[in-house]
Amino acid sequence: MKEKVVLAYSGGLDTSIIIPWLKENYDLDVIAVCVNVGQGDDMDYVKTKAIKSGASKIYVEDVKEEFVVDYLYKAIKSEALYEQDYMLGTSFARPLMAKKLVEIAHKEQAKYICHGCTGKGNDQVRFEVGVKAQDPTIKIIAPWRIWDIKSREDAIDYAKKVGVEVPVTKKKIYSVDKNLWHVSHEGGDLEDLKNEHKEDMYFMVTPPEKAKDEPTYLEIYFEKGAPVKINGEFLNPVDIIDKLNTIGGENGIGIADIIENRLVGMKSRGIYETPAGTLLYAAHKKLESVTLDKYTYQYKKLVSAQYGELVYNGLWFTALREAIDAFVDKTQENVTGTVKLKLYKGNIKPCSVDTEYALYDEGISSFGESELYSHKDAEGFINLFGLPCKIKALKNF
């Protein structure tokens, strides 16, 4: 009986040719696993293609709701970003995929897990560290670090040689990653920084100049930091993301052209479409500015950056990530309320906030006197607050 390998399968170029390559070079029984995080593929087609390519079995795991609740909601609550711009659409999906791969490897008693990540990318780290953190005995096969195929053009040629149908041409080659949260585009003419990216590549977003000519008003209701209602309507987690992707996309919201520092050392360029995430982060940030005290709000910004770094680097299965989640959950206890946004041709304008947990008090914040604040109190405060500056000036006078 042949030993088994669990292959992270998408039906795309790389994983399509890996199946015959594994059988040819390792003589393994290939178990394909497609983790459905909302990439929008025809899963019946993916199943058929995996079997036709030589897999003995194909699992399709629909984890969209788990992806939103256990991963994306953590992103929203923490407002995690990598290098201030990247909303981590790929990064948040990878640990969930690694989790499912390990679960199925255990079920199938497979000794190997294989992925189609390139030897220059971050995903190889995310998958492999994720697997090792759950089961250090599983062996990894990473074809892009082993085989003679050195480019996507070579991969297309090999696909033709082994009879695997791949809907990619050499004339227009982009590496695309899609899920509920985002679409990323890399490679091809994007690798030349002198090239403006082409707007016809967009899947989710209408180019801002072609977006609706009238503004759209949007209300998002959060409960303890998580979105639960859109325009007054309760929706399930997946439908919330889908609806906001539609609303944001038709208003030209959520495009980012980013140069990022990869974990493996080089810089790379990516075009990201994240309409729902962009709307949710903007609304959540506004609500937090009203409901969090100054020091928690400021410290959380530091934690958010650290959280984004951890997720980007594939360190999901760590004590620090769990500890940050616990801290973030504590900060979200009063992040409940409705934020109204005005959307127009790629721009987001927060219009209003309605929450019973507001730390903003109109009476105190106005220029008039109040029971809690006297203008006369300011003089003593300024004298004490500025004392170090005054002492230094006196010494140097």
UniProtKB/Swiss-Prot annotation:
InterPro entries to which the protein is assigned, alphabetical: Arginosuc_syn_C, Arginosuc_syn_N, Arginosuc_synth, Arginosuc_synth_CS, Arginosuc_synth_type_1_subfam, AS_cat/multimer_dom_body, Rossmann-like_a/b/a_fold
Lineage: superkingdom: Bacteria
Alphabetical keyword list: Amino-acid biosynthesis, Arginine biosynthesis, ATP-binding, Cytoplasm, Ligase, Nucleotide-binding
Any one Gene Ontology molecular-function term assigned to this protein's record: argininosuccinate synthase activity
Pathway(s) annotated for this protein in UniProt: Amino-acid biosynthesis; L-arginine biosynthesis; L-arginine from L-ornithine and carbamoyl phosphate: step 2/3
HAMAP family attached to this UniProt entry: Arg_succ_synth_type1 (MF_00005)
This protein's name: Argininosuccinate synthase
Encoding gene per record: argG
